[in-house]
Amino acid sequence: KLLNKLKLGRKKIFTYSDHSTVADRNNIISQFDKGISGGLISDAGTPLISDPGFKLVSDLILNNVNIISLPGPTALITALAGSGLPTDKFQFHGFLPKKNKELVTTLNECSNFSGTSIFFETPHRLMASLELIDQILGSKIHLCVAKELTKIHENFFRGTTKEVLKILNEKKELIKGEFVLLINFDEKECDYSNADKLFENLESKVSIRDISKLA
C-alpha cells in the first residue's frame, strides 16, 4: 500500500519475521550482491525495536552492505518524553516477562538501575502485571502507563501503582490498545538484595490464582 501511495510501482518485496531462516536472510543478501538498494520497514514503530530484523542487519553488515538508519517512530521514546520520569538514563526491556518468577527477577534488576526502566505490555495482561508490581514494590516506585501513543485515544496515567490501578479499575474501557510501562525507583525506599527473597515475598502476598494470570 505504501509503495502504491508513493507511486513507486511494484517492487520486489520479501517478508521477514522472527521465524525467517538463514536461507531467507541469504536470499535477501544476494539481492544486494546484485547492486540493488533496499529498505527494511515495519508495520508499526521502528524496525529492530521489539521488532524483527536484528539478525538480518547483522548479517548484512558482515557482508559489507552499507546500513543507513533513518529516524522513525518508537513508542518507548515517545512514552519516556511524556512520562515525567527521569530521562537522563533509561533502559528498555521489551515486553514484561510472562512468568511471575522472571518478572520478579527483572524488577529486582531494575531496582539496581538508577534510571527509568521501560516495558511494553499487552492489554489482557496489564492489570495482572500492575497488581503484582504493586504487591512486590508498593510505593517504592514512580510509575507511568502510556496508552495508544500518537493515536486518538492517547493517554498517560501517572502516580503510584495503586493510583494507576484505581484509575484503570474505575474506567475499564481504557484497558485497550498498546501500553508502555515506565518505572523509576525511589532509591531511598528500595533495598532488595536478590530475586529469591523478592520471589518469596511475592508468594506470601499473592494468591495462586493471581499469579496464574501471568503464566
Question: Which functions belong to the PLM regions below?
Answer:
Residues 10-17, 67-68, 88-94, 140-145:
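Short hydrophobic/aromatic-enriched beta-strand-loop microsegments
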Residues 13-21, 73-74, 94-99, 148-150:
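Short, acidic/turn-prone active-site loops that include or flank metal/cofactor-
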Residues 1-68:
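Class I S-adenosyl-L-methionine
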Residues 1-11, 81-85, 91, 99-100, ...:
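RNA substrate-binding interface of SAM-dependent RNA methyltransferases
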